[in-house]
């Protein structure tokens, strides 16, 4: 009796799943640029993102762009003593994760998962490169249409 109830529950869930005839978008590349000020947090998040990609069966490449250092020099005193200054420094570390040849559904699931687990102090920029069909007016070679027009004007 319990097996029948479980089977009925599964059938109800299957009826709730909707499918669409709309084709899924294809992405040639998905670039994720992750920025942070703390190296340990960035390393940990990179490990998490790579592990999540491997679990989904995605091929991923990681490279580390050079860090950016911003320095600010300010006077210690507001009104006098120009000789006495203070320097502040902000170091921003970057990691670039690149995934290739993804479907739109897979990309959305992966991005939602890693964005929900984004730690504090880490920023993320996502760039999607979509694959699309050529428009009809570009598919036909241009030199064939130009030569046909020249023949019409000559006669």
Swiss-Prot record:
- Where, per UniProt, does this protein localize? Mitochondrion
Pfam families from the entry?
A: Ribosomal_S10 (PF00338)
User: InterPro entries from the xrefs?
Assistant: Ribosomal_uS10_dom, Ribosomal_uS10_dom_sf, Ribosomal_uS10m
Is Disulfide bond found in the keyword set? no
- Any GO CC annotation of this UniProt entry: mitochondrial small ribosomal subunit
Q: Which Gene3D superfamilies match?
A: Ribosomal protein S10 domain
Keyword annotations for this protein, in alphabetical order, are: Mitochondrion, Ribonucleoprotein, Ribosomal protein
PANTHER family reported in the protein's UniProt record: MITOCHONDRIAL 28S RIBOSOMAL PROTEIN S10, SMALL RIBOSOMAL SUBUNIT PROTEIN US10M
Assembly and interaction partners? Component of the mitochondrial ribosome small subunit (28S) which comprises a 12S rRNA and about 30 distinct proteins.
Task: Provide the family line.
Answer: Belongs to the universal ribosomal protein uS10 family.
| UniProt protein name | Small ribosomal subunit protein uS10m
What species was this sequence derived from? Rattus norvegicus (Rat)
């Amino acid at each position: 009796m319990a097996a029948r109830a479980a089977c009925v529950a599964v059938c109800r869930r299957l009826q709730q799943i909707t499918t669409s005839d709309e084709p899924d978008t294809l992405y040639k590349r998905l670039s994720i640029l992750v920025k942070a000020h703390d190296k340990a947090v960035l390393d940990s998040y990179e490990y998490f993102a790579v592990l999540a990609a491997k679990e989904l069966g995605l091929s991923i490449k990681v490279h580390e762009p050079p860090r950016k250092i911003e320095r600010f020099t300010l006077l210690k005193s507001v009104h006098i003593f120009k000789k006495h200054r203070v320097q502040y420094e902000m170091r921003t570390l970057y990691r670039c994760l690149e995934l290739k040849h993804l479907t739109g559904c897979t990309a959305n699931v992966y991005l939602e998962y890693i964005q929900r687990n984004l730690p504090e102090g880490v920023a993320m920029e996502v760039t999607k490169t979509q694959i699309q069909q050529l428009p009809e007016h570009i598919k036909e070679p241009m030199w064939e249409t130009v030569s046909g027009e020249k023949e019409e004007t000559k006669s």
